[in-house]
């Protein structure tokens, strides 16, 4: 399984994301550059230039017309995917940590950090109403008083958002009223990543408490746990098989205070039902910050602390693999 190596960032990768069809791969890092690549051969299509700080999150809408990015330069920006033109600039008081389009692509949400005396907020904008964008006035703003949101995704049918917090809590917020619909706390430390399954019925969380967990996306009922020895930064569900891939590792600054060695975190594959690890893929130098499955399930990508993105196409053996319980 020889990976395709994508070199387009000078700093560590923060998030990678495929569009719905999977022909494009968007990558963002702790530099101001947003890159888009052809996922089939790793050719760089272009960059979205405009941010002036680290970019924390990226999302593409249903038909890949628009791209949304959130950055530490205290802004969330909307781009034309094809031309790279900046369509909207939404200023915030603190860094934008998560962002996303709803199912129809007409409503965007993003969350800001709790920093410099400012509160953590989730803001909702309707792109069909230009006045909201022009006046930078969201139709709804949800304050998060306790612990800041570290990862958030839209729930099924765009009725709610599922947010993971620094404290390990999971909340489901209504996209209409802003109230908390469900609240659970299954993780003991920060939730780094949330990714939905293809049919949006379940999602996987990756946490600093060395586990990834599977939840029902409507009830937030905890289903499965995947345990590792190091903090998990990202987890993704296969669209075809009952497989989940985990990426993570020990942060360099934590290495001396713990008994684990630096790096030493390959991409790890677990069986979804049996919670058993069945494979590992080496490659990155240092930890893995983001993983994503291609929507056809035939390849996956990982972005690391080393600033590289690797696209791995699975060998035929992967598709013939039968898990014996």
From Swiss-Prot:
PROSITE patterns referenced in this protein's UniProt entry, alphabetically: WD_REPEATS_1, WD_REPEATS_2, WD_REPEATS_REGION
BP GO terms, sorted: formation of cytoplasmic translation initiation complex; translational initiation
SMART domains according to UniProt: WD40 (SM00320)
UniProt organism field: Pongo abelii
Gene3D superfamilies: YVTN repeat-like/Quinoprotein amine dehydrogenase
Positions of modified residues (Phosphothreonine): 219
Positions of modified residues (Phosphotyrosine): 308
Record's subunit section: Component of the eukaryotic translation initiation factor 3 (eIF-3) complex, which is composed of 13 subunits: EIF3A, EIF3B, EIF3C, EIF3D, EIF3E, EIF3F, EIF3G, EIF3H, EIF3I, EIF3J, EIF3K, EIF3L and EIF3M. The eIF-3 complex appears to include 3 stable modules: module A is composed of EIF3A, EIF3B, EIF3G and EIF3I; module B is composed of EIF3F, EIF3H, and EIF3M; and module C is composed of EIF3C, EIF3D, EIF3E, EIF3K and EIF3L. EIF3C of module C binds EIF3B of module A and EIF3H of module B, thereby linking the three modules. EIF3J is a labile subunit that binds to the eIF-3 complex via EIF3B.
Modified residues annotated as N6-acetyllysine in this record: 264
Domain of life (superkingdom): Eukaryota
Taxonomic placement: Eukaryota, Metazoa, Chordata, Craniata, Vertebrata
Pfam families assigned: EIF3I
Sorted UniProt keywords: Acetylation, Cytoplasm, Initiation factor, Isopeptide bond, Phosphoprotein, Protein biosynthesis, Repeat, Ubl conjugation, WD repeat
WD repeat extents: 8-47, 50-91, 144-183, 186-225, 283-324
Entry GO MF terms: RNA binding; translation initiation factor activity
Family from the record: Belongs to the eIF-3 subunit I family.
Chief place where the protein resides: cytoplasm
Function: Component of the eukaryotic translation initiation factor 3 (eIF-3) complex, which is required for several steps in the initiation of protein synthesis. The eIF-3 complex associates with the 40S ribosome and facilitates the recruitment of eIF-1, eIF-1A, eIF-2:GTP:methionyl-tRNAi and eIF-5 to form the 43S pre-initiation complex (43S PIC). The eIF-3 complex stimulates mRNA recruitment to the 43S PIC and scanning of the mRNA for AUG recognition.
Glycyl lysine isopeptide (Lys-Gly) (interchain with G-Cter in ubiquitin) crosslink site(s): 282
Protein name (record): Eukaryotic translation initiation factor 3 subunit I
Entries under PANTHER family matching the protein: EUKARYOTIC TRANSLATION INITIATION FACTOR 3 SUBUNIT I (PTHR19877:SF1)
Recorded GO CC terms: eukaryotic 43S preinitiation complex; eukaryotic 48S preinitiation complex; eukaryotic translation initiation factor 3 complex; eukaryotic translation initiation factor 3 complex, eIF3m
Post-translational modification note: Phosphorylated by TGF-beta type II receptor.
Location of this chain's protein in the cell: Cytoplasm
